Regions:
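Structured binding elements
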Residues: 56
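Jelly-roll (double-stranded beta-helix
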Residues: 1-30, 36, 41-52, 62-193
Length: 193
């Protein structure tokens, strides 16, 4: 279980996340994270959240977003709101670390998803973009379909693919969640500068 103050690191995507306010502290109403992204670091893939609003406030550096196909560069002091169902991706387009605060509302299973993806990257179980093998991804995506989806193909096709891929992945031992080797909390990492 994620707690306020926990830190997760994805060495593949170059993201470091500190949970400022965990879902347990808000009864699932929202989660607040501070994110540090290394130069050329990025979220693993373009995605959308069908039921969640994300509010990004850039604190340091420069973050480039692609939101509904439009490129937006946000600098320190600027805020960007991504509404439910809106395809988006972000990356650090600057030459120094970028830092932003993000509120995810409602929390749903955001923490579990991030812990799963980051711990798989820590264990070397992702490709160079931070994505696990397709069968493992099908199991994870099926379990988190209310949290995150791809902007394409259409949702009905994603559901069809997951209906076939997820059972096969589970039969081969893939699980929908992964943790940092402890049942109750991720590893502790130093705070970002």
């Amino acid at each position: 279980m994620i707690r306020s103050g926990d830190v997760l690191h994805n060495p593949v995507t170059g993201e470091l996340i500190r949970f400022v306010t965990a879902a347990a502290d808000t009864e699932g109403e929202y989660v607040v994270v501070d994110v540090v992204v290394e130069p050329n670091g990025s979220v693993a893939a373009a995605h959308l959240h069908p039921y969640q609003t994300e509010t990004f406030e850039v604190l340091e550096g420069e973050v480039t977003f692609k939101v509904d196909g439009k490129k937006v560069v946000a600098r320190a002091g600027e805020t960007l709101v991504v509404e439910p169902g809106t395809a988006h991706k972000f990356w650090n387009s600057g030459s120094t670390d970028a830092r932003f605060r993000c509120e995810i509302r409602p929390a749903l299973q955001f923490e579990r998803l991030i812990e799963t993806m980051f711990s798989l990257a820590q264990e070397g179980k992702t490709n160079k973009k931070g994505m696990p093998n397709p069968l493992r991804l099908a199991v994870i995506a099926n379990a988190h379909f209310d949290d995150v989806r791809l902007p394409f193909p259409p949702q009905w096709l994603q559901k069809l693919a997951l209906a076939m891929g997820a059972p096969l992945g589970r039969a081969l031992g893939c699980e929908a969640s992964n943790s940092y080797g402890r049942e109750d909390a991720p590893i502790e990492l130093p705070a970002a500068a």
